[in-house]
Amino acid sequence: VAVCDIIDERAKDAAKEFGVEAYTDYTEMIGKADMDVIHVVTPDFAHRDPVVKSLQSGRHVLVEKPMATTLEDAKAIAEAAKMADGKLMVNFSNRWNVPHHNTKKAIDNGDLGQLKHAYARLSNTTYVPTQMLSWASKSSPTMFLLPHMVDLVRWFFSAEADTVYAVKTEGVLKSMGVDTHDTMTALVTFDNGAVACFETSWILPESLPYVVDHYVKIIGSKGITYADLAERGLRKFGEKAEYPHRTDTIYGYGRGFPYDSIYHFLECIIEDKEPINNEMDGLMNTAILCAMLDSAEKGEPVKVEI
């Protein structure tokens, strides 16, 4: 129906591609366009206003992770969602990633026994903060990548985080003109007695054959799961080595977990059921991320609070 971008040329190009109306002011789009669903894909720090106003207009809203980068913004969105007629889903798309989905099934089936420990790593090469994201200085590997890992571990554990101790390193990205930290390592205790170690980095070398390094290990009293998602997929060798993108269209339809999460949201609207992940998942996710940043600044453990 409509697309909105603050850059007029981008809005018009997208509108032409999809045959829809173009706007540069989302409030104007909300007021004029005849639509049921709004997908908010603004930079991470700019989610609050478009999400809240979209919900207040009665539309269903899908917002990209993280739901917000501050607790204040996350609480405002969560409150708006509770008051709204429409549904809100935070796009924690890795719940639809097959290895992670199968991990959750194994846990729920009791194959791993009582959960004890998780190790979750998600990192990027320097391409992401230096070339892909124009707003990287207003974000960090913690806020851009760890929302996925934190959500997965909360989902696996069916528990809430209690205490966080985190350590960051910095210097490499700042020397490249990107004002944010390089790496973050966080130890998080949960109220079910389990412990999780989270690791993220934005300074992996671009010589790596993949942009995303992604690994998750879950240890239980009866078993263990490993999910290494960095090396899976097609590798093609000719004059140069190529690692084609893992998600694509097949016979005209989008396939893979980034599409499947969106399909789920649309299904929830059509069938009037609640999304698997909602505003409370988004709020708790942001609370844990903010606790990591707070702990890294203070150099001491902090409680996860909302």
Task: Show which residues each predicted segment covers.
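Beta-loop-alpha module in the N-terminal Rossmann-like domain of NAD(P)-dependent dehydrogenases
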Residues: 7, 18-80
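NAD(P)-binding Rossmann-fold cofactor-contacting core
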Residues: 1-14
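C-terminal helix-rich "cap/oligomerization" subdomain common to oxidoreductases
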Residues: 37-42, 75, 265-306
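Hydrophobic residues in well-ordered beta-strands that form the structural core
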Residues: 24, 63, 88-90, 119, ...
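Active-site loop of classical SDR/Rossmann-like NAD(P)-dependent oxidoreductases
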Residues: 6, 250-262
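Predominantly a Rossmann-like dinucleotide-binding segment in NAD(P)-dependent oxidoreductases
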Residues: 86-87, 94-178, 299
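Contiguous beta-strand/loop segments that form the cofactor/metal-binding neighborhood of enzyme cores
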Residues: 144, 150-232, 259-272
